[in-house]
């Protein structure tokens, strides 16, 4: 696994952590945005791991 893939996965995990905190405090719309970015970062990691740009 490359450093770039690790960075994207770390960003995805951090976004999910923030989303969880937002949900717990009743901010569902804001959490949805963070979840969107978590999926984006995870997809980027997958593409990079598969050799994509």
Residue ranges and their predicted role:
Residues 1-53:
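Terminal alpha-helical segments
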């Amino acid at each position: 696994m490359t450093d770039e893939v690790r960075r994207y996965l770390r960003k995805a995990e951090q976004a999910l952590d923030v989303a969880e905190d937002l949900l717990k405090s009743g901010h569902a719309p804001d959490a949805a945005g963070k979840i969107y970015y978590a999926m984006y970062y995870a997809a980027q990691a997958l593409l990079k791991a598969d050799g994509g740009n």
